[in-house]
Amino acid sequence: MVSTTLATITIMSTLVGYTTGPLTDYMWLLIVGFIIAFVLAFSVGANDVANSFGTAVGSGVVTLRQACILASIFETLGSVLLGAKVSETIRKGIIDVTMYKDIEHVLMAGSVSAMFGSAVWQLAASFLKLPISGTHCIVGATIGFSLVAKGQQGVKWLELLRIVASWFLSPLLSGVMSAVLFYFVRMFILQKKDPVPNGLRALPFFYAVTMGINLFSIMFTGAPMLGFDKLPWWGVLLISIGFGIITALIVWFAVCPRLKKKIECEVKSSSPSESPLMEKRELHEAHSPILKPVPEESSVLSSSTPTTPPLPPPEERRVTFDIGDSDDADQKDCKESDLGGAPKTAHVHFTNGPAHIPSNGYSQYHTVHKDSGLYKDLLHKLHLAKVGDCMGEGGDRPIRRNNSYTSYTMAIIGMHGDFKPKESEFRASEDGDKEKAGAQERKRIRMDSYTSYCNAVAENGTPEDLGEGEVTLEMVDEDAGSSRSSLEEDRTDADKPEVSMLFQFLQILTACFGSFAHGGNDVSNAIGPLVALWLVYESGSVISSAPTPIWLLLYGGVGICVGLWVWGRRVIQTMGRDLTPITPSSGFSIELASAVTVVVASNIGLPVSTTHCKVGSVVAVGWLRSRKAVDWRLFRNIFMAWFVTVPISGLISAAIMALFNYVIL
């Protein structure tokens, strides 16, 4: 990052070396501005790019590395081809720059202050894994420095009111549209016994709408580089509709037949079931024994004398999950417990009665499958606990909720033995009494998630078949009766593999389009003030009709990509996993509906934010899929971050501008 910035500054210095003018003495402001602009672009990449690929990563359609590669390509292309138009709006649309005539150096200092304030708050939000609007950041920072430099004169307060309105309009409109779209997808495709025929029939329509909406969004920006600024709105509309129809025909005659054959081949190669493709993993695992003897255990059993009386079976065994506050607070909570403190925890108790104690000498450790109803039921209870993730009665071993889908262990039914956390590993013992000398330690044998789920169900029956004295799940301060209804409600949430094959490329396509449009729109958040700084320095006047230099847009695009690779995973994790589980079908509904909302609302004059639209869609679809799967506490934190974005970025910018105005300049 430092080398790229220094190289750009060197080139810039060479270009302006022959320029002489009244602002030559303020070249240091230009250099500082380039450095801060790159940091700002870095923060935009770390935070805002999650809007495009967060749901795609969360649904498993692409890996994080693949998302970073695709986003780097399309963000850079979008910033170069589309960024010039939007940079003009950021440069001239918030304040009246004519007020700074004859005091151009004050506007230069203000641009540096605005970039600094926006960068600091976006980096802080990225650290906290909170998606915020980069546009609102730079607008708040611009207003902040203007209030210090010129007071309320020249500030366009109507723009600020539009921003406040967008906090509520954006998530509401996009959420409603996403929920409606997903409702029809679920009704006519997902809930059918065989979803493939209806899915194939709907595929051309989905592709046509996706291509048409995204093409219209890109062309309507009027990018000068591509000549779109010369097209009338009706011309853009006709081109978009025509391109969508052509796409639908290609998909119907070329893509659908090939996809149908591919699905049929997958179905034929697997045993018949409700979800045939899922059985392939079972068939592969059936060739290898899952439970193997443990050498240490065998030696202990062989050395034991037959005269040793067997220990009486315990009447009840209980494992308690102490659930802490958040991933970042795990270590803090555990330290507090070590120091004798009492961190705030809630307890999830799993009680296993003696009816199912294994007699074959094995203790089984089951990993919960990410798409099982039991996993989602536990996920719901952890969310409602509103506290974090420490496991074990003493907080010995923290569970990371967001590390992977296998972090909620020991929640599966069929849990055997008494579990005691150790420093190096967890072992299962025959009895929970630590003082009894004859207790034998048994190693837990890890199973793959889907196989362990099937084995547990085969051994113990479905959760409905188990009595209260055998396996129960209860939670302090929560109605235990909600477990059964939540489990039944969430069983049909996961997409069948056939459905995933239908929607996965659609979701990748919408994510790429979104990344391209995002590069054109949000590069202005990083480069808009820098463009103003550069043009003022080069021309010596605040009134400049010069076009935005392409190399400045490329500079911002590179900074965005660096931020994405270094720190982008944090907010991607929030958008794709933490708020609610995402599937390919729900991810596609989120992407398409939020894109439609942005295009329609922007063109009828309603203030919307891409970030707010995407978060609203994620929450609405997650709530529709499962009433209890949305982390409402996290959504509350995100909304509070939206609320303080403009004031905080404005205050930071105002403080830096005051330093410039009263101390440095």
Curated annotation (Swiss-Prot):
A GO cellular component entry from the record? membrane
Composition bias type Low complexity, residue spans: 296-306
**The entry's keywords:** Membrane, Phosphate transport, Symport, Transmembrane, Transmembrane helix, Transport
Q: Where in the cell is it found?
A: Membrane
TM ranges are: 26-46, 67-87, 107-127, 163-183, 202-222, 235-255, 499-519, 548-568, 588-608, 638-658
**Protein's UniProt keywords contain Ribonucleoprotein:** no
Q: Does the keyword Membrane apply?
A: yes
What's a BP term from Gene Ontology annotated to this protein?
phosphate ion transmembrane transport
- Locate the compositionally biased regions of type Basic and acidic residues: 329-338
Which intervals of the chain are annotated as region Disordered? 294-345, 423-442
Q: What is its main location?
A: membrane
Q: How does it sit in the membrane?
A: Multi-pass membrane protein
- GO terms assigned for molecular function: phosphate transmembrane transporter activity; symporter activity
> So what does this one do?
Sodium-phosphate symporter which plays a fundamental housekeeping role in phosphate transport.
Family per similarity comment: Belongs to the inorganic phosphate transporter (PiT) (TC 2.A.20) family.
Q: What is this protein called?
A: Sodium-dependent phosphate transporter 1-B
